[in-house]
């Protein structure tokens, strides 16, 4: 199983690099990794269990990992907080790692993003302005319509999540490093 975890970190590493350089995570990478994970887990299940049932168990666990790991990112995408490539990358990581390890990598990725984003904003000198606008967005629904503070879309900050996803996948691999391959 460790080989699948390493593959997930490698896919996340390539995605982080392309996301940092271009702002996009390519479909060939995410969907290719997702498809390869399904096929590889099917054949790995057959090899380990010496039966078709083992293959379908591996395939099912891989598909479940993709779905489970895409749920929270899909909600964030629906709310306009992340891009579609991030969802597909989380799904590919879930398919490669299965649900539990995929969710572990996802949790580490969101923790990394929660640490990196404020540091990045502070480096650019935008931290306190962004925090003020964020507070206004949180408080606005509780204000009267005439007292609401509008935030123009051009002042909203966008954060590339790919590097944080790589950090999450790498930490997950390190946490499982001593396990059986």
Regions found by a protein language model. Give the residues of each.
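A membrane-topology feature that recognizes alpha-helical transmembrane segments
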Residues: 1-82, 87-181
């Amino acid at each position: 199983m460790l080989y699948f975890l390493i593959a997930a970190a490698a896919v996340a590493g390539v995605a982080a690099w392309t996301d940092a350089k271009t702002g996009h995570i390519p479909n060939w990478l995410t969907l290719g990794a997702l498809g390869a994970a399904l096929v590889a887990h099917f054949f790995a299940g057959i090899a380990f269990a010496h039966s078709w049932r083992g293959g379908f168990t591996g395939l099912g666990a891989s598909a479940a990992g993709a779905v489970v790991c895409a749920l929270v990112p899909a909600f964030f995408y629906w709310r306009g907080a992340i891009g579609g490539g991030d969802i597909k990358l989380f799904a590919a990581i879930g398919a490669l790692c299965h649900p539990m390890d995929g969710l572990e990598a996802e949790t580490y990725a969101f923790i990394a993003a929660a640490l990196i984003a404020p540091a990045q904003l502070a480096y650019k000198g935008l931290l306190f302005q962004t925090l003020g606008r964020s507070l206004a967005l949180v408080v606005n629904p509780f204000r009267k319509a005439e007292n609401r503070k509008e935030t123009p879309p051009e002042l909203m900050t966008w954060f590339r999540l790919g590097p944080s996803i790589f950090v999450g996948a790498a930490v997950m691999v390190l946490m499982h490093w001593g396990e059986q391959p």
